[in-house]
């Protein structure tokens, strides 16, 4: 029913199944994804958050959906208990940037390095952006030097241009 886009019918069946089989992870996942298909991010995240009490591996997915829903503090709270360090740190970096907590994001550098996440071009650019945002330009430049991806290289070039503007005309960068 979900695949045929008969969402209400699917929701009715899955909600009943969830009440009858509250421990069934598959029912919870199907229900959450049906809500996702309808753009009901908070409902989907809440269901996965409850399912994560039985299977902690679902914690990252619930946190990600809360992040996409704009509930960054809730996402950050769930993120704290994710076991997979790579998933945890990559997600935390994106949440901190969304919250404009650039200092905290920049302070993740050693953790990102230790877990090998700085090999990921998107993570490296995100870290450079955080460093730029707190005016640590030399460190931001160091990370921008490693970008090879064409789109990220273009963004890095623009960030470098903005750094020059901020150095010469600091009043434009408040």
Where in this protein do the model-derived segments appear?
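Register position in tetratricopeptide repeats
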Residues: 3-4, 33, 37-38, 68-69, ...
């Amino acid at each position: 029913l979900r695949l045929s886009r008969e969402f209400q019918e699917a929701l009715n069946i899955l909600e009943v199944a969830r009440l009858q089989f509250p421990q069934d992870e598959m029912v919870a996942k199907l229900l959450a994804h049906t809500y996702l298909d309808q753009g009901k991010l908070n409902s989907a995240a809440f269901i996965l958050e409850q399912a994560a009490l039985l299977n902690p591996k679902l914690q990252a997915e619930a946190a990600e959906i809360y992040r996409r829903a704009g509930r960054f503090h809730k996402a950050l709270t769930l993120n704290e208990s994710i076991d997979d360090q790579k998933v945890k740190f990559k997600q935390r970096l994106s949440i901190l940037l969304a919250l404009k907590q650039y200092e905290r994001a920049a302070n993740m550098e050693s953790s990102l390095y230790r877990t090998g996440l700085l090999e990921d071009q998107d993570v490296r650019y995100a870290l450079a952006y955080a460093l730029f945002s707190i005016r640590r330009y030399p460190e931001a430049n160091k990370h921008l030097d490693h970008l090879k991806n064409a789109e990220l290289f273009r963004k890095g070039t623009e960030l470098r241009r903005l750094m020059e503007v901020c150095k010469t005309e600091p009043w434009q960068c408040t």
